[in-house]
Amino acid sequence: MATRWTLSQAQALFETPFLELMFEAQQIHRHYFDPRQVQVSTLLSIKTGACPEDCKYCPQSARYKTGLEAERLMEVEEVLSSARKAKAAGSGRFCMGAAWKNPHERDMPYLEKMVQGVKEMGMETCMTLGSLSEQQAQRLAHAGLDFYNHNLDTSPEFYGSIITTRSYQERLDTLGKVREAGIKVCSGGIVGLGETVQDRAGLLVQLANLPEPPESVPINMLVKVKGTPMADNDDVDPFDFVRTIAVARIMMPRSHVRLSAGREQMSEQTQAMCFMAGANSIFYGCKLLTTPNPDEDKDLLLFRKLGLNPRHGTTESGDNAQQQALAAQLLSADTEQFYNAAR
């Protein structure tokens, strides 16, 4: 039976001396995972900007003047072309994100074709499209969608200070519909929104206490974008971010904890501590929707320095070839390792 976490228990973990917390997180990580393996994914923005939501951190909101040029939903073949290049570079999972409050019914046939096309290549599929109805979740599942990303962002108590156009319960409801449809769940949050340590603990309690914890838990560091209300937020202390990764690993021992947005602004040493704390998934060689990710050669060098190996997805078709291709690129410094799906 899964552990039911209390807020006080989560806060106690955050208050644990740093090195003791790291030791506990690493022990748990090694019990459930190979500590040298990191799951790698490619992310593509299939519809950018003009989002009606008011998330204060997001440059894709139509409410803020960030200089982001809005783009319509990409053509199916254009998306599949990007997926082919990602697979050729060794990616095991292809994630597609759209700046919507929710997908329109007129878009569903195109989204289904994207999922089907990527699946036919032997890759895992993931989408993040906003809120879903039960029927939409079922249609995506029928098309073969493996993962659906829908973040909770922060604690229920702090959430209203960040977003007013979508309720916390609506996010939880979407996760429930996704799970009910048989799609794996990807859900996490953001550090650096102005939240307290108690809010970080509250977020992780919400995630860990879902009927089934998410298979993937992305922990993002706020990327401050000029024009958004959070452009001048205080920087996140690297130790506080690493601590959040460690607590997530302890509270959700079987989940993949993803080091996600904000990696561009992290030093190699901070990223290394995140991996030590239990992070075992990244987006690589891509632009995270509208914010930068480390250059491909930087990812290559860091993997080699730390002795980390890419872990392919669980899709049966083509997995061995994908793993071998990426592993070969990791070992060859004169090869372009990572495909930038946002170019």
Curated annotation (Swiss-Prot):
Reactions listed under catalytic activity: (4R,5S)-dethiobiotin + (sulfur carrier)-SH + 2 reduced [2Fe-2S]-[ferredoxin] + 2 S-adenosyl-L-methionine = (sulfur carrier)-H + biotin + 2 5'-deoxyadenosine + 2 L-methionine + 2 oxidized [2Fe-2S]-[ferredoxin]
Q: Where is the Radical SAM core domain?
A: 36-254
Entries under InterPro entries matching the protein = Aldolase_TIM (IPR013785), BATS_dom (IPR010722), Biotin_synth/BioAB (IPR002684), Biotin_synthase (IPR024177), Elp3/MiaA/NifB-like_rSAM (IPR006638), rSAM (IPR007197)
Free-text cofactor note: Binds 1 [4Fe-4S] cluster. The cluster is coordinated with 3 cysteines and an exchangeable S-adenosyl-L-methionine.
Q: Name one GO biological process term.
A: biotin biosynthetic process
Specify which residues bind [4Fe-4S] cluster according to the UniProt entry for this protein. Answer: 51, 55, 58
What Pfam families would the database entry show?
Answer: BATS, Radical_SAM
EC number(s) given by UniProt = 2.8.1.6
Q: Source organism's superkingdom?
A: Bacteria
Q: Which UniProt keywords apply?
A: 2Fe-2S, 4Fe-4S, Biotin biosynthesis, Iron, Iron-sulfur, Metal-binding, S-adenosyl-L-methionine, Transferase
GO MF annotations in UniProt: 2 iron, 2 sulfur cluster binding; 4 iron, 4 sulfur cluster binding; biotin synthase activity; iron ion binding
Pathway this chain belongs to? Cofactor biosynthesis; biotin biosynthesis; biotin from 7,8-diaminononanoate: step 2/2
Per the record, the similarity remark reads:
Belongs to the radical SAM superfamily. Biotin synthase family.
Q: Which NCBIfam families match?
A: bioB
Can you state the subunit structure given in the record?
Homodimer.
Q: What does this protein do?
A: Catalyzes the conversion of dethiobiotin (DTB) to biotin by the insertion of a sulfur atom into dethiobiotin via a radical-based mechanism.
* Protein name listed in UniProt: Biotin synthase
User: From what organism does this protein derive?
Assistant: Erwinia tasmaniensis (strain DSM 17950 / CFBP 7177 / CIP 109463 / NCPPB 4357 / Et1/99)
